[in-house]
């Protein structure tokens, strides 16, 4: 079946909402982390709300705005209320962005061709020669799966270490295509219970668990680290950690497992995209609280526990 021109464009270009250089938490060594736009989940605690939508949107930096009201001339694109602009995101905003003198109005992402993104990645190749590499994150990288596989192949050809951070909520077909070109695979298993996962992320955990079962029984199992972000009252419960560990070690007793402390700093990003963040009252866990969760995982039978 022939691909439509629009479909070919989607494969040859990717929407990227951030490229973070010198990252140290997304794999070994100093890394360049590429954040792909679009995610099938809607986690209540999402750390990157600007990466949720699959389309390019407009964001507003309140701290940059000088209240010149230049944007008020664009009445079809902007509804100005309470001393701030609200955007109709189906409109073309090129002229609006050019008009804003303080860059308070910007697109939330950029289009990258394979060559353009590869050139950007290779700006840091000196670090890749000393244990670093590139990590593909999001959003959900598999939402732009065909492009992802193409850039992974290019990285492997250039001998650049590759990692991915993924929810694994995607087709097994795409996973199988990507795995040969990945050196490290971080997979989030947030909440074991399917109904609770549905409530907290808007999708069931069934597909994620099926895909995890496949990869932990495959030849690529040693590349995998399963992660659970610890969110107060949601994923950070003894029962949830116990269920996840029992599930994992039943598939592969040598599985590597990591728990990530809650990060309360994401709330500032929600204002940029005009979304409400409902977890402002939650705080990071203390060292003692984290040790408790480690103990729960160890008592459940995990052998390879990665600690912060």
Residue map of PLM features:
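Iron-sulfur cluster-binding cysteine motifs and their immediate structural context
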Residues: 44-51, 70-86, 94-110
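Class I S-adenosyl-L-methionine
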Residues: 101, 122, 213, 294-298
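Short cysteine/histidine-rich metal-coordination sites, predominantly Zn2+-binding motifs
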Residues: 59-65, 83-89, 111-122
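Conserved dinucleotide-binding and phosphotransfer motif residues
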Residues: 103, 157-158, 300
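Flexible, acidic/Gly-rich N-terminal and inter-domain linker regions that tether
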Residues: 1-72, 80-81
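Auxiliary Fe-S-binding modules of radical SAM enzymes
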Residues: 2-28, 221, 230-308
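Conserved AdoMet/S-adenosylmethionine-binding subsite of the radical SAM
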Residues: 115-272
